[in-house]
């Protein structure tokens, strides 16, 4: 999204999978899903017990049981990621606020919103659809935040339909 603002000529369409301009709540008008204190607590857990953090976060992200294939993949990926790099990534994601950038996007967008997403509520997909000038909102009937991993067939089908291929 940000790249399309800086270099719009490089993009003819965007496909946004489970996007959010901000995970943080910004009362009263924007509900990103998390209060700052909650995310700071999550970062503290990460600092104190990285493996415990990954065991907690993996099923939250996947929206599946701890022993599911998708959750297991997340746990394995977290386990092999340098905690310092994971922390930098988590900080950049959790505390970013790109709401002002949304209206700057002029590239047509497909928003793939997960129906039951613990990280990005459906209201965020609706917010993006309302604020992205040329967007389509497609609700994927899936749990979790990563349908590209848990239900790639649904994501591919929606992408092909949007791209008309």
Regions found by a protein language model. Give the residues of each.
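Flexible "cap/lid" loop of the alpha/beta hydrolase fold
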Residues: 1-48
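Active-site acidic short loop of glycosyltransferases
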Residues: 8-9, 106-107, 134, 165
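Conserved alpha/beta-hydrolase catalytic His-Asp/Glu region
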Residues: 25, 29-34, 44-103
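Hydrophobic "lid"/C-terminal helical patch
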Residues: 57, 90, 128, 155, ...
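Residue-level signal for the nucleotide or nucleotide-sugar donor/cofactor binding architecture
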Residues: 81, 120, 147-150
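Short alpha-helix in the alpha/beta-hydrolase fold that links the catalytic acid
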Residues: 91, 98, 107, 121-130
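Short beta-strand/loop motif that positions the catalytic acidic residue
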Residues: 105, 111-113, 117
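Catalytic active-site module of serine/aspartate enzymes centered on a nucleophile-bearing elbow/loop
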Residues: 134-165
